[in-house]
Amino acid sequence: LRKDSIMLKKKQAYTVAILGATGAVGKESLEILEERNFPIETLRLFSSKRSAGDVLSCQGKECKVEELTEASSFAGVDIAFVSATDTISRDYGARLGAAGVVVIDDSAIFRMDPDVPLVVPEVNAAALRSMKRGIVAIPNCTTTPLVMALKPLRDIAGIKRVVVTTFQSVSGTGSAAMDELVDQTKALMAFQDVKVQVYPYQIAFNLLPQVGSFGDGGDCSEEVKIVQETRKILEMPSLRVTATTVRVPVLRCHSEAINVELERPLKANDARAALAMGLGSDVVPADKLLESANGVIRAERASGQYLKDRER
């Protein structure tokens, strides 16, 4: 490890904090910590004033949500998941990292910082060896599966160019967007007018060819993120990447169509074999796609819990 790297000390159990605990990503983090039986000694949950006082459960224990303020103390915290707004990440991420806390940040604030590793463990786990600021940045939700698919191909045949089109569910915008899709769908099925609040236009039964805001160059912010983050994670700063992003009327589960131009010839069977060996990847034959449990993420798997919660 580098001498200037900040790393987590090995312990039997850790004090874990989640900033933005009542949001969609925060709740998902809680579920994953529970599923993986992560060794938690103390769990501290933070949110805005609106959600402070709520009680959430993890690993069979209930935890009261604290209001996140400038006076909040993080003494004794080992790991902090920051899954709130960019402002929260900017204000608290650096502060926690400087205090020796290992910060796992979900925002775009630190992703392109040269002193902050942008990590997909299946692709570039070695980047964790250099954590000068004590912060690990999580890539954009569409960048992660893209680089996981590209790495095996790059390793055996090199990559010249990537063209990717994403089809992104409303969960990427947050809980309010998921609620709006359900409410708009119900209204349209009942021949009623829809309310448009989260997106510029109606999302139910529609496609929006824009994820994020448009810049001067004509690309939207999501497309810029994909290009920049892919280059950083793969350590290919000159890689030619073209991205088009589309918001689709689906609660959860993104999809991507990826076209890759390789540097060296590669047989289709060899490409399939390389992808199948990639960590976190499944290769499903085209004629088996609809038959395989892993081939298609079915609606009840991707959105079932959200819909159950809506019914309560």
Segments from the language model and where they lie:
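A broad, low-specificity signal for short, low-complexity segments enriched in glycine/proline
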Residues: 40-45, 101, 204, 214-223, ...
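Oxyanion-binding "anion nests"
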Residues: 204-252, 257
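C-terminal active-site/capping subdomain that shapes the small-molecule cofactor and substrate pocket
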Residues: 239-312
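Histidine- and/or cysteine-centered catalytic micro-motif in compact active-site loops
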Residues: 48, 167, 208-212, 244-246, ...
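Generic short amphipathic/hydrophobic targeting helices enriched at N-termini
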Residues: 2-3, 293
